[in-house]
Amino acid sequence: MTSRDFSPTGIRFENIEKRYGGLAALRRIRFEIAPGECVALAGRNGSGKTTLLRIAAGLVRPSSGELTFPSAVGAAAGPAPVASKTEPVRAKPSAGFVAHATMVYDELTAEENLLLFAKLQQTLSPTERVEKLLHEVGLFDRRDSLVRTFSRGMRQRVAIARALLHEPSILLLDEPSTGLDPQGVAWLAATLRQLRDAGCTILMSLHGESEISTLATRAIRLDAGLIVADTRSGAEVRSILTFADA
């Protein structure tokens, strides 16, 4: 997927809280992901996984706390402090995000979707980069087809390709295998493994054990917006991800 080496960047959550009215979606979230680490989030629906990922992506502003992106040498890279109510938190520009609900434009072709975002992100050599990704996600032969004609799995491939356009140093994924067939899951696992091995920092939410979950070297379980487990022990990581919804 990529021949580049990343400048490893971590993610630090400092006492992050998120409230929606009287509902606390996240409470006292404090942990750090090391540059180049691959971390899986587990927990029931509504436990706070998606909210945490959206905060990391800069799409949701926390009610309190601070989000920073330390580099491998310890300097803060792209700090994202809590902003005013009118100013959203800014995510690190090199982060890629894949949402649980595929965020693609139905009335555009697969190629048009990627070219649009490549130009918005000022991707170098956008046409060549888009063609390369379409080949790698197995959609080059369908590049001129409207996305509304695609299956859910094919739409997810477009969304994943979009997140990889600028070869991000941080990749955030919310249940990325949703709608993918076994071949698609195998492709995604191979892609994430290559990115991880190149130094990309990965934070992803997962439901159950799969080929993708085996990539995680750390698992964090959320329950009612709180971190209730955080381990790098191989056996415990597997246990948490095997019973991710328990």
Description of each model-found segment:
Residues 115, 119, 125-142:
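Conserved ABC ATPase "signature" region
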Residues 206-207:
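H-loop/switch region of ABC-family ATPase nucleotide-binding domains
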Residues 171-174:
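Catalytic Walker B motif of ABC-type/P-loop ATPase nucleotide-binding domains
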Residues 167:
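Conserved catalytic motifs of ABC-family nucleotide-binding domains
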Residues 42-44:
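The feature captures the beta-strand-to-loop junction immediately N-terminal to the Walker
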Residues 57:
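Helix-to-loop junction immediately C-terminal to a conserved catalytic motif
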Residues 160:
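Hydrophobic anchor residue at the start of the ABC signature
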